[in-house]
């Protein structure tokens, strides 16, 4: 019956002309979002600045453009920079011959108790079965997020002092401070206390930071309760995330401390082989770093058939009711493709939009005034970009159109040689019963931002499936404990690499709530704990998602960094491969649901301690040191870390300072490991 209707509709469409539409050819330098900004008077006019990637024709152009347009260039990767451009200068910058490309990228989405027990982080904090306890002391945890409550007791130490050392609020509207040309930096306890919070509309960052480094004053402590925090309140742009990573790495270097960074935001749009601008820039910042680790959420799209994969595919593109969606069609290197977008009335067959877009060269176009009832607001911006690393083409679409219930979009993709990957940002793909059409898949729903080679990409499992609010309301979820969280995004990457790298508890996770946020930001049934400190009541609540799983991993990595401050991402992957938890329901690992399994903090620590025995540490640098028997103080020069071991290899003391008191140790012979800027050295010291 459906086939007969389809044939009738096709015949009708032949007899009805397509309604007129307005078509504008735009600069080929622009991606779809940049084209939107430049070609529309409605979008983001209130913003004084625009965050973008700028690719230059040569090095000399940078200083010239800075002076001419007051551009702030920040992080560099090859000939491309993250940049802050005055909104009034955007058109002129885009037209400047010294600018090879100007891409705005996509807006980031938020990737939104029992956890410590399930991954055995509680055993590290208590020191169970180990020579010492591990709480993250001496380690930094950097969180790039939004909705931070700097006053929450979850971020205080045992004496009540705030463990947040530094904050960069990228959204602060006061006069910019810091090196990046936007936002404000709070770099003292007084400034952080005075600011109190970054905004009153979100609480995500307070929850995420609490998972990674909550103080443990309640049952709902974080993974690394004695780690210090450095926060970046993000503007949710790709460039803001890259600049934030750069900021945190520089802060760690300036303070001579190891750092674990967490990013629980991302976007589905972009090249998913790790070669996209954002993934590539983050990789360039992290590559070769010791003691600088990063976790990133894979996203919560695992329940949505938002991906089309194939050489020749047709499907109905189910755009959300709000009418706004983005589509990114990625070819493999050396291939080409065409994409036909069709908007029609299912009943009458009337066609409102029909155009075929092709790769082979870079271009950017805008279409307006199509459709039926919403013609005046209808907008479709499309651009074809070429990856300057792999040479692969992609076509990006930004659609804004409130379609009628009888209208639908369809997409037809044809490639020359290899499979094409198409991703819908907010919608999904469905065959709708049409002959020759296919449903979308939830494969390759991993966020573009989690496809890099350096960060650890984290999926989510279920920590618990029932909880009771402080008002007595019980919530029961239809999830299997320790099973994959149904929304946790799946791999593989478009180049075949497995993602996620690892999974961690991320569903029904309890953590702290931004006390400055409006009550509507959290449902009352999800608030499970409260505590009054200094006359003010603070709350803890339940949230779900890979946003919660990623900081679990960041916190565990902080514990591992406490044991080995020079730990690398490659070493972390080895630990995960050897020690992650496995059960038969996960299937053969690694796979694109669970990665290498669920992180096991204790097993990873034991493996780390076993593989960094004193006998394996080379003597590559001579550190200057002296021991004062009267004061029992060990003093060193040019060292980053000091570790003191018993003669049988048990770790007894450690510090990231150049001086260490041994007054708490009994008389005897000890081994002291000194890590300097040029290498490591082991000395014997008799007290």
Per-region residue spans from a language model:
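Active-site core segment of subtilase-fold serine proteases
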Residues: 148-206, 222, 347-427, 517-518, ...
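Subtilisin-like serine protease catalytic core
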Residues: 21, 128-241, 256-257, 289-293, ...
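C-terminal outer-membrane/trafficking sorting elements
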Residues: 616-687
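C-terminal subdomain of the subtilisin-like protease fold in secreted/lumenal serine endopeptidases
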Residues: 39-43, 255-276, 285, 289-300, ...
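Catalytic-core segments of hydrolase enzymes
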Residues: 164, 259-354, 360-361, 398-513, ...
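Autoinhibitory N-terminal propeptides
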Residues: 4-6, 11, 17-132, 140, ...
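Hydrolase catalytic cores
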Residues: 209-212, 217, 230-241, 246-260, ...
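Positively charged n-region of N-terminal signal peptides that target proteins for export
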Residues: 1-4, 687
């Amino acid at each position: 019956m459906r086939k007969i209707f389809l044939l009738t509709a096709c015949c009708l469409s032949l007899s009805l002309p397509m309604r007129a539409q307005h078509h504008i050819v735009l600069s080929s330098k622009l991606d779809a979002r940049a084209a939107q900004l430049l070609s529309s008077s409605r979008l983001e006019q209130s913003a004084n600045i625009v965050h973008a990637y700028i690719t230059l024709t040569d090095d000399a152009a940078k200083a010239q453009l800075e002076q001419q347009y007051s551009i702030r260039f920040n992080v560099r990767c090859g000939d491309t920079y993250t940049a802050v451009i005055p909104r009034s200068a955007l058109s002129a910058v885009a037209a400047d011959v010294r600018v090879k490309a100007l891409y705005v990228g996509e807006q980031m989405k938020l990737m939104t108790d029992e956890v410590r027990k399930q991954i055995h982080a509680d055993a590290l904090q208590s020191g169970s079965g180990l020579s010492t306890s591990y709480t993250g002391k001496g380690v930094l945890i950097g969180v790039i997020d939004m909705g931070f409550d700097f006053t929450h007791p979850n971020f205080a130490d045992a004496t009540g002092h705030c463990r947040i050392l530094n904050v960069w609020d990228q959204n602060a509207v006061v006069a910019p401070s810091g090196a990046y040309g936007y936002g404000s930096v709070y770099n003292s306890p007084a400034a952080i206390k005075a600011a109190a919070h970054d905004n009153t509309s979100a609480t995500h960052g307070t929850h995420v930071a609490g998972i990674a480094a909550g103080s443990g004053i309640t049952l709902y402590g974080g993974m690394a309760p004695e780690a210090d925090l450095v926060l970046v309140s993000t503007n949710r742009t790709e460039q803001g995330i890259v600049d934030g990573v750069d900021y945190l790495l520089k802060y760690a270097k300036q303070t001579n401390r190891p750092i674990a960074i967490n990013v629980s935001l991302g976007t589905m749009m972009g090249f998913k082989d790790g070669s996209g601008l954002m993934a590539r820039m983050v990789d360039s910042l992290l590559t070769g770093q010791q003691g600088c680790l990063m976790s990133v959420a894979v996203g919560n799209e695992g329940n949505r058939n938002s991906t089309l994969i194939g050489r020749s595919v047709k499907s109905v593109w189910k755009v959300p009711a709000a009418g706004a969606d983005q589509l990114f069609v990625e070819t493999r290197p050396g291939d080409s493709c065409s994409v036909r977008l069709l908007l029609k009335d299912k009943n009458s067959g009337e066609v409102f939009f029909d155009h075929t877009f092709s790769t082979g060269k870079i271009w950017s176009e805008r279409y307006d005034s199509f459709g039926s009832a919403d013609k005046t607001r209808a907008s479709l911006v499309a651009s074809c970009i070429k990856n300057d690393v792999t040479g692969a083409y992609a076509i990006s679409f930004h659609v804004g159109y409130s379609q009628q219930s009888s209208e639908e979009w369809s997409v037809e993709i044809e490639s020359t040689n290899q499979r094409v990957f198409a991703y819908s940002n907010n919608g999904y793909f469905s065959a709708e019963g049409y002959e020759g059409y296919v449903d979308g898949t939830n494969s390759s729903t991993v966020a573009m931002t989690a496809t890099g080679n350096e960060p650890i990409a984290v999926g989510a499992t279920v920590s618990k499936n029932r909880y009771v609010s402080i008002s007595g309301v019980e919530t029961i979820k239809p999830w299997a404990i320790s099973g994959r969280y149904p929304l946790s995004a799946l791999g593989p990457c478009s180049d075949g690499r497995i993602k996620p790298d690892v999974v961690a508890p991320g569903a029904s996770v309890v953590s702290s709530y931004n006390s400055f946020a409006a009550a509507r930001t959290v449902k009352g049934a999800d608030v499970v704990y409260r505590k009054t400190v200094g006359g003010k009541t603070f709350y803890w609540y339940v949230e779900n998602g890979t946003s919660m799983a990623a900081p679990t991993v960041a916190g565990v990595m902080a514990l591992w960094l406490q044991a080995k401050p020079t730990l690398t991402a490659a070493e972390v992957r080895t630990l995960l491969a050897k020690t992650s938890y496995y059960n038969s329901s996960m299937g053969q690992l690694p796979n694109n649901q669970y990665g290498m399994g669920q992180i096991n903090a204790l097993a990873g620590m034991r493996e780390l301690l076993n593989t960094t025995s004193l006998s394996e540490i080379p003597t590559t640098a001579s550190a200057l040191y002296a021991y004062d028997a009267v004061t029992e103080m060990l003093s060193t020069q040019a060292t980053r870390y000091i570790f003191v071991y018993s003669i049988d290899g048990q770790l007894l003391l450690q510090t990231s300072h150049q001086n260490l008191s041994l007054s708490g140790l009994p008389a005897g012979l000890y081994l002291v490991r000194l890590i300097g800027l040029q290498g490591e050295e082991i000395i014997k010291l008799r007290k």
